[in-house]
Curated annotation (Swiss-Prot):
Protein task: Stimulates the secretion of gonadotropins.
Segments passing through the bilayer: none
UniProt entry keywords in alphabetical sequence: Amidation, Hormone, Pyrrolidone carboxylic acid, Secreted
Record-listed Glycine amide modification sites: G10
Pyrrolidone carboxylic acid carried by residues: Q1
Protein location: Secreted
Protein name, entry field: Gonadoliberin
PROSITE patterns according to UniProt: GNRH
Family that this chain belongs to: Belongs to the GnRH family.
UniProt GO MF annotations: hormone activity
Pfam family, one: GnRH
This protein's GO CC annotations: extracellular region
Organism, scientific name: Squalus acanthias
């Protein structure tokens, strides 16, 4: 998956 939460590069 690909999102912007802070801990995942998105």
């Amino acid at each position: 998956q690909h999102w912007s939460h802070g801990w995942l590069p998105g």
